[in-house]
């Protein structure tokens, strides 16, 4: 499925960068033990690679001092995370606040323009365009400029809410079915 497949003739197109806040991550110094093993979940792409919509746990945690003394940022519940280096384009939505490393971007929709749940599903569609635009000599990288080059259709907010509810309901049913399959094995 492509952006053109979902665009309604009355929907306006916007550059992706004009409807989102793009947030960079960071890593506290690993040589300072006081920055690690705290209570703040710290995401890397290994924590959310896969088909699940939500990420709810992380392998590593940092302390408040680690967050305060590094370029790591704390994302909010509902924010979206996308891998930007190496394994480009892995995507998930946060089920709780988490910090994250510099190999990812946090994505927060501008609330007056886009519903956050709708944004997640829209990104699922444009992720292949983001991957195609990735570049790098050693490994693929999505840059801030990549988000400026992608145009997306936007229905009115009320339509976005309705679309996101339907798709969210389907995701919930898929998750239940997957849990049933896992317990049957």
PLM-predicted stretches and their roles:
Residues 1-26, 149-162, 168-185:
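Non-catalytic DNA-recognition/assembly elements of restriction-modification systems
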Residues 88-95:
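Short, Lys/Arg- and Gly-enriched loop/turn segments at beta-strand edges
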Residues 100-120:
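Short peripheral tails and domain-boundary helices/loops at the edges of structured domains
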């Amino acid at each position: 499925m492509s952006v053109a497949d979902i665009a309604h003739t009355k929907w306006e197109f916007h550059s992706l960068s004009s409807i989102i806040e793009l947030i960079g991550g960071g890593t506290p110094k690993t040589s300072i033990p006081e920055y690690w093993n705290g209570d703040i979940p710290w995401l890397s792409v290994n924590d959310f690679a896969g088909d699940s919509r939500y990420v709810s746990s992380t392998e590593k945690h940092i302390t408040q001092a680690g967050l305060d003394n590094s370029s790591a940022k704390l994302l909010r519940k509902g924010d979206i995370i996308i891998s930007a280096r190496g394994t480009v384009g892995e995507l998930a939505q946060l089920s709780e606040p988490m910090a994250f490393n510099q190999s990812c971007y946090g994505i927060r929709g501008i609330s007056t323009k886009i519903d956050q749940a709708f944004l997640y599903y829209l990104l699922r569609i444009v992720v292949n365009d983001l991957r195609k635009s990735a570049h790098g000599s050693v490994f693929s990288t999505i840059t801030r400029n990549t988000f400026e080059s992608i145009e997306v259709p936007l229905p009115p907010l009320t339509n976005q809410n309705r679309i996101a509810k339907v798709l969210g309901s389907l995701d919930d049913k898929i998750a239940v079915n997957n849990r049933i399959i896992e317990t049957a094995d």
